[in-house]
Amino acid sequence: MPLITTEKQFESDIAAALLSPAGGYTRNGDCYDPKLGLFVDTLIRFVQRTQPNEWAFFEKQNPVNPVRKFCTAFNNACDADGLLSVLRYGFKHRGRRFRVCYFQPESALNQKDAQRYAQNEITCNRQWFYSDTTHNSVDMVLAVNGIPVFAFELKNQFTGQTVENAKQQWMHDRDPREVCFQFNKRILGYFCVDLTEVWMATRLAGKDTRFLPFNQGSNGAGRDGGAGNPPNPNGYLTAYLWEEVFQKDSMMDILQKFMSLQDGKTLIFPRYHQLDVVRKLVADVRQKGAGQHYLIQHSAGSGKSNSIAWTAYRLASLFNTENKPVFASVIVVTDRTVLDAQLQETISGFDHTLGAVEAIGEDKNSGDLRDAINNGARIIITTLQKFPVIYTEVNKTAGKNYAVIIDEAHSSQTGTSALKLKAALADTEDALREYAELEGKAEDEIDPEDALVKELTSHGRHKNLSFFAFTATPKAATLELFGTEYPDGSHHPFHIYSMRQAIEEGFILDVLQNYMTYSTCFKIAKTIPDNPDLPASRAAKLIRKYEELHPYNISQKAKIIVETFRETTSHKIGGRGKMMVVTSSRLAAVRYFHEVKRYIAEQGYDDVQILAAFSGAVPDGGVEYTEQSLNVRADGSHIAESQTKKEFHNNFNVLIVAEKYQTGFDEPLLHTMIVDKKLKGVKAVQTLSRLNRTCPGKTDTFVLDFVNKAEDIREAFQPFYQETFLEQEVNTDLIYKTQKELRSFAVYSDADVEAFSKEYFRSTKQDKNAVGRMSSVLKPVADRYNQKTQAERYQFRRLLRSLVKWYGYVSQVARMFDEELHKENVFCAYLLKLLPPDEVSPLDLEGKLQLEYYKLQKTFAGAIELEHAKGVYEPVTQKGALGHDPKEPLDEIILKINEKFKGEFTNADRVLLTALHDRLLADPKLAKLARSSDPQIFTESIFPKAFDTAAQDSYLEAQDTFSSLFEDTSKYKAIMSALAEWLYGEFRKK
């Protein structure tokens, strides 16, 4: 008999799984009433069986046709509150509450609720004829006590149809006006399913219905990969939908604890990775208890706010086997004010018994945070910076567990505020026992209130603190602190939803697909006859700043900015596209603002409306400018800083920024970014990611970069495109190397550290003379410091800062119990505050420089492609002290700047040579070969092939520039020889 591959067989296989004992569903044999949108007999039977007294009351109040009137009351409740709310809380009729379903209790000890849950009639029906005006049927419907809640259209590639056909069917063949398809009245989720993919929507809106992918990811949920689903050796690729997601208990769990109504108009069904991460986190906590650390690497576009809200709610409502909450409080640490409102709205829709979410926002102080913790608030939202003020005022934490959810976990988690959070919440019983053993004392001999003991025992991990760190761009320190340690010593995220998957699934746009870079070519000359010695790096920065702020430079770029907006941005997103200009400084932002305005007026353009965004006041030309003074509406009124975002969204289309709105700014209409600032690492990813938000009509983005090379941007994004992990844990003993280097300066001694510690850690240190005594101890140390040379003072301060920062990191990772080192760290932290940096004589180059030559040249246009590879961090190491800024003659500094930015423009060969040098210098493979080869092998055997490839690639990008290279053999060989020798030396230095 031939194998059956029809759609009916697909439908039959799904139904068989759902109707099995494992699936938990039964087939509904009752009739469906299309006008009421209910399996009426099923609903009434459930109410009569589970709430006999309430039903008797209802019949008494409604003796004529009580069934029809009950259905009417139910429909009225759905009209008023929505079906999701009615499912969770029921509805009231004449003072009596009627429940239409019961959910599984959190605690297994709650037998009564468990029995009620078992009385639900959870049904699955094939070929659901939903209308009395058409003969159309939906392939499958799932109902709770006669109320249709989820529906499926199934397609089969073997019969020539896919999920795309199912989408069309939902959009064009299903009337949203039908009772069963009205928003939040019956069906809460519309699914399109084929053999390989699942898509879903929560609102039918004809051709405007928005379907989202509901797939696991190409390597499975929570794993590194792209869009789609992994192979399933045991059946269909999409079997997770009916075997896991819509298994009876799972489906009821989603209705009770995941689905939410936001803004009263958007019904949220969790995406697969969100459902997966929350359930895996809860399962791990149930298995291991408190004290674990979890790193969740979820990209922009992952719905991180909802994931945090669901995680917070589930952790706050999690009970142990003794029917007690696992966590005394769940504390969400965030700097995003939008998360406050979203968490409160989402959680209040789940459970009215948890109490209000305590948001300790800008309008509240640290005392409010202390009170919320001491009063046992179930969910608290706060910033990290409020903990240092109250960490000693939190009541006894022994025996209490806390869950700390960190929104956008970065290196701030290695600082003082993070340590104070731990000090406030930690149950130090185990740490005290460990400390006593190391000291060779009985536990009762150790005073837990001793200041030094309290600080030492707050370090490292604690059995009562669970950390859940969410971030799209984990740094090495973040992985070390929160990542899961593998047997080989590497640290990995607990769960991953990668940037690659978010892009491939269409939740964010790839901001690197349309990227254009320019190089700024200029030559600067000095206008004075003398040639003074100046600090090289400071002078170089000033000269570079001179070029950046030069009126000619800004005028040329302003023209490109305006014309790019008019030619590209203004035509995007249905004519609503917007642009952001990222400048290098507040002064640059002010000057760009004026120059762009001038150019717009000069050209007579009326379609470019600009705003500026920066903090504080900026003096320029004797006038002080603020954001509010520059930003003016069409009616002449000034725009307050708090209104800039709103005005940009509604009435303006170009925003010029300086260190503002580069992170956390969510404007979906932002299409184009002009970059005139050096961007590196996480900062580059966060800044450019302002463009990646999606909205109807937005299909691409555009970046024009005046400063950064395409390769630099690729290197910034690559580590976060897929999974990021730390190859090896930190060597905590490296801190002793820094300590030894500090001591070599002989600025302070053990006696100084001990004298300071005696004052700092004494129990009465809060008396009025404590600060005076501490500063008295530090005074002779400062005197010895001041006797050092300027270069030595610079080195010492760098090392001092390094030790304090390094110790803060190490004490988060490990509990060292090194009293002497801890004392020295506290001593160094206060000494650092006392030692002022050396007075730096101002460099005045005003009137001493002039711009001789300037040219903007396009160097790259196209897509910056990222590899399908994981990002790897080497172990975190300490930063050594940097050398003092040497002085060089002004002529020499200008020569170096001109060389770096191709100042000798009369010689075309020099441009060619420099371009090839830059391309080859950026080749990591070539660098590795240079470091492992002798000069002859490198120049004769290795380099020629690399040079030829670079020359050909360069020719393809700029034929006019590089054609002469292939026309003159002697020139080709001369340049290749010169570069081979030069680059070999450069590579060997690294």
Please name every model-derived segment.
Residues 226-238, 242, 477-576, 593:
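Interdomain helical connector at the RecA1-RecA2 junction of SF1/SF2 helicase-like NTPases
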Residues 370, 376-408, 412-423, 430, ...:
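Conserved RecA-like ASCE ATPase "motif II neighborhood" in helicase/translocase motors
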Residues 654-657, 662-686, 701-705:
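A short beta-strand element within the Helicase C-terminal
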Residues 25, 39, 48-51, 56-69, ...:
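Catalytic cores and motor modules of nucleic-acid processing enzymes
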Residues 414-511, 521:
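Post-DEXD/H (motif II) to motif III coupling segment of the RecA-like Helicase ATP-binding lobe
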Residues 690-719:
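Conserved segment of the helicase C-terminal RecA-like domain
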Residues 544-655:
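Conserved C-terminal RecA-like helicase domain
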Residues 2-329, 338-354, 385, 399-401, ...:
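ATP-dependent helicase/translocase motor core
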